[in-house]
Amino acid sequence: MNTYFIAGTDTDAGKTVAACAFVQYLVKQSQQVAVMKPVASGCHWQNGQLVNEDALNLMRQSNTSFDYDRVNPYTFEAAIAPHIAAADSGVVIDKERLLKAVDWFHERPIDSLVIEGAGGWQLPLASGLRMPQVVKEVNAKVVLVVGLKLGCLNHALLSLQSIKQEGCDVAGWIAVQTGPEPMPRQAENLASLRELLDEKELASIPYLPGWTEEDLSIYFHK
């Protein structure tokens, strides 16, 4: 089974739309694809259960079906940094629990597991625990989502440098236009990303207000 981790250059970089696009792309390759959002804040109550909209969107794009708790083990209502939300809730985000949650999918009949992170790459989860430590242990290939906004060149370069320093493999990167208006000189910035980044550009996704109903796989490069 292939395991992919969708990381962002920062918060609101477009991770969810990119992750859903990647899931659609893999499904079109005739793969059985499972999804995870291991840690999520900004959750809401639905039928007596805390759920996260990003996780629900991922589940809608997947062609496999698993219980919500398998997809999103840690849920927090407050829309704040997960380690702070966890502390407020009297919860400690546990590395072993996260590793076991991922390992559970390894025992299922699936071809790929797509894991969406939270926040940026170096997300703190608990005292002495950051998301990259989990990503490395589950041997996931990282897909970096670059939100096309001012500062994205620096953020992309720093994120990729950090991913490699953590000993993780990079599957490629996806550019996402994050708002209705393109960033200043967007075409030139995208060209600069292509020049500066050695890793493969997987897709470039425009701003799509109704993206949950779109075929996002068309934005992947052949």
Curated annotation (Swiss-Prot):
Q: Which organism is it from?
A: Idiomarina loihiensis (strain ATCC BAA-735 / DSM 15497 / L2-TR)
Binding positions (substrate):
41
Q: Which residues bind ATP?
A: 12-17, 54, 116-119, 176-177, 206-208, 213
**Amino acids binding Mg(2+):** 16, 54, 116
Q: Which GO terms describe its cellular component?
A: cytosol
Entry's NCBIfam families? Answer: bioD
**InterPro entries named among the record's database cross-references:** DTB_synth_BioD, P-loop_NTPase
Name the pathway it acts in.
Cofactor biosynthesis; biotin biosynthesis; biotin from 7,8-diaminononanoate: step 1/2
Molecular-function GO terms, alphabetical: ATP binding; dethiobiotin synthase activity; magnesium ion binding
Q: Which reaction does it catalyse?
A: (7R,8S)-7,8-diammoniononanoate + CO2 + ATP = (4R,5S)-dethiobiotin + ADP + phosphate + 3 H(+)
User: Which Gene3D superfamilies did the record assign?
Assistant: P-loop containing nucleotide triphosphate hydrolases (3.40.50.300)
Entry annotated with the keyword ATP-binding? yes
Provide the gene name from the record: bioD
- CDD domains linked: DTBS
Q: What is its main location?
A: cytoplasm
State its location(s).
Cytoplasm
Question: What family does the entry list?
Answer: Belongs to the dethiobiotin synthetase family.
Quaternary structure annotation from Swiss-Prot or TrEMBL:
Homodimer.
Supply the EC number(s). Answer: 6.3.3.3
Q: What is this protein called?
A: ATP-dependent dethiobiotin synthetase BioD
* Gene Ontology terms: biological process: biotin biosynthetic process
Q: Which UniProt keywords apply?
A: ATP-binding, Biotin biosynthesis, Cytoplasm, Ligase, Magnesium, Metal-binding, Nucleotide-binding
Keyword Nucleotide-binding on entry: yes
What functional role does this protein have? Catalyzes a mechanistically unusual reaction, the ATP-dependent insertion of CO2 between the N7 and N8 nitrogen atoms of 7,8-diaminopelargonic acid (DAPA, also called 7,8-diammoniononanoate) to form a ureido ring.
List the cofactors. Answer: Mg(2+)
Q: Which EC class does it fall in?
A: ligase
The positions flagged as active site in the entry are 37
